[in-house]
Amino acid sequence: MAGEIPDLVALERTGTGKGAARQARRDGMVPGIVFGGDNEPLPIQIPFNRLLKMLKAGRFKSTLFNLKVEGHEDVRVICRDVQRDVVKDLPTHLDLMRLRRTSRIKLFIHVDFVNHAAAPGLKKGGVLTVVRPEVELEVTAGDIPESITVDLTGLNIGDVVTISSVTLPAGAKPTVERDFVIANISAPSGLAASAAEEEDEEGESEE
């Protein structure tokens, strides 16, 4: 998301506590709180339908927003939590944290896989097994990437993609030091089964 910062428009919530939050929900709003920085926590509310649309669009929690609340200066925020109804799975409350563009934060970033047709292993019927569809990275708040890209060109059956083999966006680094696996290309089940049978036959002949 190293481009234009999208606006998140909210209203200041006059009341606080569970009663005020319930009233906000009855009015078709989702209550929330803005915290962090040098200012006091700010109770807010966002129209339910608007928030739901943004959540369905994806990557809401890995997007830096320009929060606009009437009567307050615009501030950059990131969502730290969205509470949901346990039955309906609909948003009931959200927590936003104030940030500076230079702040370092940890976020889960989506992994995109490209050039499937250029992977010999997939052409032979191999299966791309994604171990981590998202990777936690430490990034700068003003330069949050939409995704990281894994190039499958030249990969064969049995090849493994680790974090060290991926080119990360400038300023981003994994939160885990070990060289963890992101994906691999495994043999199709039929080929794997025949290989296992061949190994069994070889073992029997040696006996």
From Swiss-Prot:
Pfam annotation, one family: Ribosomal_L25p
Family statement drawn from the similarity comment of this UniProt entry: Belongs to the bacterial ribosomal protein bL25 family. CTC subfamily.
HAMAP family referenced in this protein's UniProt entry, alphabetically: Ribosomal_bL25_CTC
Entry-linked InterPro entries: Rbsml_bL25/Gln-tRNA_synth_N, Ribosomal_bL25/Gln-tRNA_synth, Ribosomal_bL25_b-dom, Ribosomal_bL25_C, Ribosomal_bL25_long, Ribosomal_L25_dom, Ribosomal_uL5_bac-type
Species of the source: Ruegeria pomeroyi (strain ATCC 700808 / DSM 15171 / DSS-3)
Keywords: Ribonucleoprotein, Ribosomal protein, RNA-binding, rRNA-binding
GO biological process: translation
Name this polypeptide is given: Large ribosomal subunit protein bL25
CDD domains xref list: Ribosomal_L25_TL5_CTC
GO molecular function, one term: 5S rRNA binding
